[in-house]
Amino acid sequence: RPTHRFPLLAGCLVLLASFATLAQTPAGSAERGKQLTYTCQGCHGVTGYKNAYPSYHVPKITGQSPEYVINALTEYRKGTRKHPTMQAQGQSFSEQDIADIAAYLSSLKK
């Protein structure tokens, strides 16, 4: 039975690591995040804005969980997630900016 304990232990360590990452994320301000998403709105079709590139598929980002937005923007910032435009956007944001953007986008309906 000791072989069954290793996967459980490994799973617990991964879970703890993800909680540690979230614990280090600053609290986000949805009000400030709204201002920061100005450049996002044309491409991602945030309600009230016309999509600037109707023939180019981009993901809908409104209503996403804060964790999803934080992880995606952080990965673009680090260069581990690839897309030239989004990497440039991600690199322009601080951790606080990313938390604020996540707070705003997660407050909107999908």
Where are these regions (language model features)?
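N-terminal secretory signal peptides that target proteins for export/translocation
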Residues: 1-4
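Bacterial N-terminal signal peptides
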Residues: 9-18
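Electrostatic cytochrome c docking/interface patches
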Residues: 19-37, 49
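Short, solvent-exposed mixed-charge patches
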Residues: 24, 109-110
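The canonical Cys-X-X-Cys-His
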Residues: 33, 38-46, 101
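Axial heme c-ligation environment in periplasmic c-type cytochrome domains
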Residues: 51-60, 75-109
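Conserved strand-loop elements at the edges of beta-sheets that form or border functional pockets
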Residues: 63
